[in-house]
């Protein structure tokens, strides 16, 4: 079975690459992002809109309310194996994402070492200036999405439920927005009414949080198992 894996740090264009590949091959894309399994976090987690999908199919490892918490890496890995098995007779699958814990689960599992032909695209982390430019553009889109709620509207809506607050405080983007509100002595709902200067500071701060996460991803990702640019068989990763 052919598996096309696209992985790398946040804000490096994985999703757009996966969509383009899906258009070329007709294969569905399976997201390897644990936060994207919660539709209530669609914008903040970077779920592409229907328009952005351009007619391609995107699958998720789960579809759960935030009250159930973020799916664990172990559960996500089990779901991943099941999805791959389900698509075995359909010609292949595109795997796309940047979950450190899930990719490390894959690296530690013997399941992936045989019976697959791997095509791997590893997106690299750009220099800080280039990354911040891309990340700020992404955050601006999250604040004013073409469809659905903004990241702040998602936050405000979910913050009303006290038991969801610890979960939100642990997720990039939402975490910094809450910190920004605290530092400026405002409530989360007041983030919807920022002036241009304050909004730019919020955008910069969220982008910096993404940079910190991207650097951690770059350090913690497992190494690709083969140096060949072309497809290969055998373990996809080496620890």
Curated annotation (Swiss-Prot):
Alphabetical list of InterPro entries matching this protein? P-loop_NTPase, Tzs
Q: What is its EC number?
A: 2.5.1.27
Q: Does the keyword Transferase apply?
A: yes
Q: Highest taxon of the source?
A: Bacteria
Q: Which Pfam families does the protein's record reference? A: IPT
For this protein, the record's Gene3D superfamilies field holds: Crystal structure of tRNA isopentenylpyrophosphate transferase (bh2366) domain, P-loop containing nucleotide triphosphate hydrolases
Concerning its family, UniProt says: Belongs to the isopentenyl transferase family.
Q: What is this protein called?
A: Adenylate dimethylallyltransferase
Annotated source species: Rhizobium radiobacter
């Amino acid at each position: 079975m052919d598996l096309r894996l696209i992985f790398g740090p946040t804000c490096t264009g994985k999703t757009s690459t996966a969509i383009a590949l899906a258009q070329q091959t007709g294969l569905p894309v399976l997201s390897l992002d644990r936060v994207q399994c919660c539709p209530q976090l669609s914008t903040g987690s970077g779920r592409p809109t229907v328009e952005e999908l351009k007619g391609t199919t995107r699958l998720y490892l789960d579809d759960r309310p935030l009250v159930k918490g973020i799916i664990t890496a172990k559960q996500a890995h089990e779901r991943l194996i099941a999805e791959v098995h389900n698509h075995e007779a359909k010609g292949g699958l595109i795997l796309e994402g940047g979950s450190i814990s899930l990719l490390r689960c894959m690296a530690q599992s013997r399941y992936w070492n045989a019976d697959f032909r791997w095509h791997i695209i590893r997106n690299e982390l750009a220099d800080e200036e280039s990354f911040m430019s891309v990340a700020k553009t992404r955050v601006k889109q999250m604040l004013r999405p073409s469809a659905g709620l903004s990241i702040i509207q998602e936050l405000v809506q979910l913050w009303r439920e006290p038991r969801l607050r610890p979960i939100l405080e642990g997720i990039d983007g939402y975490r910094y927005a809450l910190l920004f509100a605290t530092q400026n002595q405002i409530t989360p709902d007041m983030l919807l009414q920022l002036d241009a200067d304050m909004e730019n500071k919020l955008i910069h701060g969220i982008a910096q949080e993404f940079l910190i996460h991207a650097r951690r991803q770059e350090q913690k990702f497992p190494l690709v198992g083969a140096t060949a640019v072309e497809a290969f068989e055998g373990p996809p990763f080496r620890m």
